[in-house]
Amino acid sequence: MPASRLVRQVSAPRNLFGRLVAQGGFYTAGLQLGSGAVVLPVICAHQGLTWAAGLLYPAFCIGAILGNSLSPLILQRAGQLRHLLMAAISATAAALVVCNAAVPWTGVGVAAVFLATTGAGGVVTGVSSVAYTDMISSMLPAVRRGELLLTQGAAGSVLATGVTLVIVPMLAHGNEMARYHDLLWLGAAGLVCSGIAALFVGPMRSVSVTTATRMPLREIYWMGFAIARSQPWFRRYMTTYLLFVPISLGTTFFSLRAAQSNGSLHVLVILSSIGLVVGSMLWRQINRLFGVRGLLLGSALLNAAAALLCMVAESCGQWVHAWAYGTAFLLATVAAQTVVAASISWISVLAPERYRATLICVGSTLAAVEATVLGVALGGIAQKHATIWPVVVVLTLAVIAAVASLRAPTRIGVTADTSPQAATLQAYRPATPNPIHSDERSTPPDHLSVRRGQLRHVWDSRRPAPPLNRPSCRRAARRPAPGKPAAALPQPRHPAVGVREGAPLDAGQRIA
């Protein structure tokens, strides 16, 4: 074993997985209790601000676009101290939830505050998604990353369920709005605990070349799109990820669909927590058996089942009951849980370390742009309770996503070397003309010439090999000693020639 790897393994925390679970569990619980996708839309609907409820998720997506754009620059400054960055992110999210709980919930002013804090929360989430994905990709092997995300979701859901069922009834002694205030305050407390737990995670063992080299934001996106154009696996990944954005919006859609029912908020919060617990156990087994393809296909089918249940319940006049909208919301929650975990498992294995943060940033930005447009559309049509065609739209999008999931890779296998760079796919190996190796050292001009280098390599590989008896080569050749095999010229040779530098030539081959 190399000494560098031995030092890294010795310096890594022994219970790193448990510390990451604790940090992510508190973060998940805090976001559930102060969720801008479930809690704030229901509060706006109860206050009669239906227009604000439909604009909350688009505001979040706009902030996420800005956060994704700023994330490479922030990661460059953070370096290996990602645990401090995650602590700052948790503290900022807690401050935003406190603002939502402290502002008076009267008039149009509360809608403006909710929209502003939701947009700022999108910025925080955009930075957090890229930073956390890159951090766990460096700290954990490929087979543990999806398990970590599902375990964090389960731990956070259990905590949020216990708080909602036990602590909130003990604290709330007023009307329904008093309970909503308590939910937000407890959500802020969970985010503070997440920030404290992040301090014990420790710094990263290594940082990728892309994040260590400071580059302008324009060049970062130019490099990301150049790689996307030249790498078929990333185009396939990005197309599938964009088609699954409506699945991620399922929780917001069905929460707005059930917002008119009295007492629906606590039911939705509890069911979202239960859904994450059930989904954690379900998706972990599916991930081990069927890989990313099974995760995405199961997610699309569950979302389609939720839409079908909603259509049947509304047609029969049963949607106002808790069992109807609660079951549909539970299915949508389980379906949306695995979209992020599947995308992280997909891209963290295939993306080289030097390009990982850039590709995650580009993919998250495109997904946020689509979520902004779809969020406005779905948030508006979800509140049309008198018609059933909005649910038909959701069902159609789920069927399209299910078909697209068949192109995803299956099980992910890891070789004897469990480092992130050694992770490989068993059933899906992309064949590219000029694959990008993770051990290369690049400069900003190389990033800008990825596409040109790919085309030059393909062109040179199809050209016939140059003749070996060129005058320039004959003058530079050395005659071998009698009885010894000839050696190739020490000058670098193109891989298309078929002879490696310094490799012995065949006995019947002429000397150049």
Curated annotation (Swiss-Prot):
It is found in: Cell membrane. The chain crosses the membrane at residues 25-45, 55-75, 96-116, 123-143, 148-168, 183-203, 238-258, 263-283, 294-314, 329-349, 359-379, 386-406. Residues 428-512 are annotated as: Disordered. InterPro entries: MFS_trans_sf. One of its GO terms (cellular component) is plasma membrane. The keyword Ribonucleoprotein does not apply. Signal peptide: none annotated. Its main location: membrane. Keywords: Cell membrane, Membrane, Transmembrane, Transmembrane helix. The keyword Cytoplasm does not apply. This is Uncharacterized protein Mb2232. It is a multi-pass membrane protein. It comes from the Bacteria.
